[in-house]
């Protein structure tokens, strides 16, 4: 089976992006998986922030997850890639007005201070994940949004996984070109061939 989802405030989903948090999006994802996939084995596929949420799911579904495929996953990006790089003026504005329009890597984000604070409750780099899973991360060499060192740090916290970090030579952050998607499909298929039957979640 295959389950794809958008978080609230994304795409055609209900709500506003600025009302969401890492915690609320993680909870929403847990509910959908429990409702739609019951107790099936899972391969998680997460892109950018979705990679962060995917890693959060291990706490609940650790006995069911058999593989994780990250596409430029961005855990803790709110602190490391945003807050830490904001000027004091921007930080004061965000605290006072609760929102800030942030432009980064060709993308525009309406960031709430609540989202920043919530991100601090969802750290993953201070943890160790001792799960014997297949872990594959694809990261574009030309990614201007999430630096490759983030993916390398993720590889380190998954101690017992069968790990693979793939750097796509001309890839950007989205890795949405046909050849990139073909490579993604190939990597998922490689896991699929060893672990049937299960469900893919992305």
Regions found by a protein language model. Give the residues of each.
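Conserved alpha/beta-hydrolase
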Residues: 1-14
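Catalytic nucleophile-loop/oxyanion-hole region of alpha/beta-hydrolase
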Residues: 11-36
């Amino acid at each position: 089976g295959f389950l794809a989802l958008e978080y609230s405030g994304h795409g055609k989903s209900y709500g506003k992006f600025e009302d969401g948090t890492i915690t609320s999006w993680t909870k929403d994802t847990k509910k959908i998986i429990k409702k739609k996939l019951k107790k099936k084995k899972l391969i998680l596929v997460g892109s950018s922030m979705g990679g962060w949420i995917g890693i959060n799911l291990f706490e609940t579904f650790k006995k069911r997850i058999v593989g994780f495929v990250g596409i430029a996953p961005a855990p803790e990006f709110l602190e490391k890639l945003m807050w830490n790089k904001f000027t004091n003026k921007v930080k004061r504005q965000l605290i006072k007005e609760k929102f800030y329009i942030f432009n980064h890597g060709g993308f525009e984000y309406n960031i709430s201070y609540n989202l920043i604070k919530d991100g601090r409750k969802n750290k993953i780099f201070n943890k160790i994940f001792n799960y014997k899973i297949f872990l594959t991360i694809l990261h574009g060499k030309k990614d201007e949004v999430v630096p490759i060192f983030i993916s390398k740090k993720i590889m380190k916290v998954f101690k017992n996984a069968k790990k693979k970090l793939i750097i796509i030579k001309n890839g950007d952050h989205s890795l949405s070109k046909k050849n990139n998607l073909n490579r993604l499909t190939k990597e998922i298929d490689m896991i699929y061939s060893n672990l049937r039957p299960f469900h893919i979640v992305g």
